[in-house]
Amino acid sequence: MAAAAMATVAVPRVKLGSQGMEVSAQGLGCMGMCPAFEPPKPEADMVALIRHAIAAGVTFFDTSDLYGPHTNEVLLGKALQGGGVRDRVELATKFGKFFAGGKPGIRGDPAYVRAACEGSLRRLGVDCIDLYYQHRVDKKVPIEVTIGELKKLVEEGKIRYIGLCEASASTIRRAHAVHPITAVQLEWSLWSRDVEEDIVPTCRELGIGIVAYSPLGKGFFSSGAKLVDSLPDHDFRKLIPRFQPGNIEKNAEIFERVNEMAARKGCTPSQLALAWIHHQGRDVCPIPGTTKIENFNQNVAALSVKLTPAEMAELESYASNVHGDRYPLMMANTTWQDSETPPLSSWKSE
């Protein structure tokens, strides 16, 4: 599949959830453009990539006030200036996860929610955020309280749609009862499928769209085990159990099998992994991240890869025995498995 052909794949539009939001069938995750522990990528190159994406039909951009921190939103804001660009894109950002004094924190209290939104609006240079996610659930604050403040921001015209990240099915239900949730962002890929049992069916029952982050297994399905050798010293992926010695060697076999199938299909392993996500349904939008136009073009080309039910089953069989968890133990309390909040009756506002 030639690079020139990759850039010409038509990107469909899809409904994200049932509240009226429409996005490109594949988005662009922007986190890697401003790595937390490395120098940022050249701004001009990243702006060029974002504008290339828009020209190619990918208009759904994902960022967060955590990334940088803050600099990722500033970068995206610059890329969307001028020429009516803002009106052509769907802008998603997040709040609630931060570092203070070198330590991670999570907040979802009303005052923090409002201040975070105002900060993101300012950095992005926009009047309204299309999709505003709670980046991680604050287990100290009833989810009804957090969503209640987000509902006010919708009513004030500062955000259009509300989303959650890494939330359990019960938390999603409680949130949705306060104000309709448009999308839930979760890790979903060939080797991260635990959300399929409860969360995905809950979203579909409630008419909530699904945004799949890390659809390439945090880069694993792009280059396999050799990815680990190329990671900078401070890259957090070096802490992930799946990439640790003892596990990565066993997981390498998964990549080799996927790579063999990709060769038969005339595509790359990363395109095959993305195609698998696309075949989960039109209510699922993956947001692979990249900092290179060449890789972006390859990712978009995944939209043209067709899989039969037998091929889907074959792919899934390759990744049925993954070695190692998707997050290190110190981050396990920030996943959907540990995202329950106190009952609303326990809340005493300050």
Swiss-Prot record:
Coiled coil: none annotated. GO terms for molecular function: aldo-keto reductase (NADPH) activity. The keyword Repeat does not apply. The keyword Oxidoreductase applies. The active site is at Y67. InterPro entries: Aldo-Keto_reductase, NADP_OxRdtase_dom, NADP_OxRdtase_dom_sf. It is an enzyme of class 1 (oxidoreductase). NADP(+) binds at S214, P215, L216, G217, K218, G219, F220, F221, S222, S223, G224. Transmembrane segments: none annotated. Substrate binds at H135. Keywords: NADP, Oxidoreductase. Its EC number is 1.1.1.-. Pfam families: Aldo_ket_red. GO terms for cellular component: cytoplasm. Belongs to the aldo/keto reductase family. This is Probable aldo-keto reductase 1. It comes from Oryza sativa subsp. indica (Rice). The lineage of its organism: Eukaryota, Viridiplantae, Streptophyta, Embryophyta, Tracheophyta.
